[in-house]
Design a protein with these regions (language model features):
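Substrate-binding rim/cap in mid-to-C-terminal beta-strand-loop elements of soluble/periplasmic
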Residues: 1-39, 43-58, 147
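Non-transmembrane alpha-helical segments in soluble domains
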Residues: 2, 25-29, 33, 46-49, ...
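A structural signal for well-ordered alpha-helical segments within the folded catalytic domains
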Residues: 19-26, 40-43, 82, 131-134, ...
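Cytochrome P450 catalytic domain signature, combining two hallmark sequence patches
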Residues: 56-57, 107, 156-160
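C-terminal, low-complexity/hydrophilic appendages and adjacent surface loops
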Residues: 67-151
Length: 177
């Protein structure tokens, strides 16, 4: 994330705190002097602008990608990220069978359905297998995420911790797999 705000952020400064797109709206409201509604997720990034460490900042984050099979053909997955590790769970039906899992792709008139129909008309979809697959990366030793260490000797403890964290995020955010 790159932000230019000359009166409040020093040029070429860096912040390594974990931020997400859900933090944008709370930040804009904060900069405008408005309170964030209680129902709105995310946290204002303004405390990070000073460059000093922020004591009460998130220690992990959750993300969910669910637009398969349209757009990029990236399989459905969700995951958690901590300062050191990222655990990713790829799941779901493959190919056109995945449409039954995506409530928008099967609903006529939605952009997802329009995209799906356009891609189907040019035989864009393959008959991908159904999957249930995990990846784990040590971001400290493998920042480019090239070496999946899930299931490798010595990773069982962190896998268990991150799976519990992922389950808690899913429960608290009411995420259906």
């Amino acid at each position: 994330l790159i932000i230019s705000y000359p009166k409040h952020i020093q040029p070429k400064s860096e912040c390594n705190q974990m931020v997400q797109n859900i933090d944008f709206a709370p930040t804009f409201l904060d900069l405008a002097g408005l309170d964030k509604p209680k129902y709105m997720p995310g946290t204002s990034l303004q405390p990070l602008f000073a460059g000093a460490p922020v004591k009460k900042w998130r220690k992990s984050l959750y993300y969910h990608y669910y637009d398969y099979p349209t757009y990029h053909l990236v399989r459905k997955h969700d995951g958690v990220r901590t300062e050191r590790y990222k655990l990713i769970h790829f799941y779901g039906k493959g190919g056109e069978r995945a449409v039954v899992e995506n409530k928008y792709q099967g609903q006529p008139g939605t952009r997802e359905n329009n995209c799906f129909n356009a891609l189907k008309s040019i035989n864009y979809f393959t008959d991908d297998a159904d999957i249930d697959y995990w990846e784990l990366y040590d971001i400290k030793s493998d920042p480019n995420e090239l070496h999946n260490i899930y299931g490798k000797p010595g990773t069982q403890k962190i896998e268990k911790e991150l799976k519990k964290l992922l389950a808690n995020y899913r429960k608290n955010l009411k995420v259906d797999e």
